Amino acid sequence: MPSFKNIFKVVGQDGPAHAAQSGDVMERIRHDVQGNKVLLYMKGTPEFPQCGFSAAVVEVLNGLGVPYESRNVLEDPELRQAIKEFSNWPTIPQVYINGKLIGGADIVTEMNQRGELAALVK
């Protein structure tokens, strides 16, 4: 009869393939963040946000008239987890401007109200 230690070892033995796949997602995130002036990781799409926080960020960005790219984390569970690890930020949405994490809905809304966000996206 296998011990728990052995069972866990067997269950986790798919690690290298998963690690390679995770590395691919991290590379895709890195490429997207560096390659887009304004990038939004969100639940849903700008046309159909799937949470109130994502909708709030879309409203702010659209209100500024700034072009931005978005990624729907609901379409890709691996992306949804990887973006949180990439940024060390636990929630979605996440807004990146000029390759740097700005924050989520509360921070973006507050920066917009103070006029700071418009200066960053120009």
Predicted segments with their positions:
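Residue-level detector of anion-binding/catalytic polar loops
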Residues: P67
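Non-globular targeting/processing and membrane-anchoring segments
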Residues: M1-N36, K43, E47-L64, L74, ...
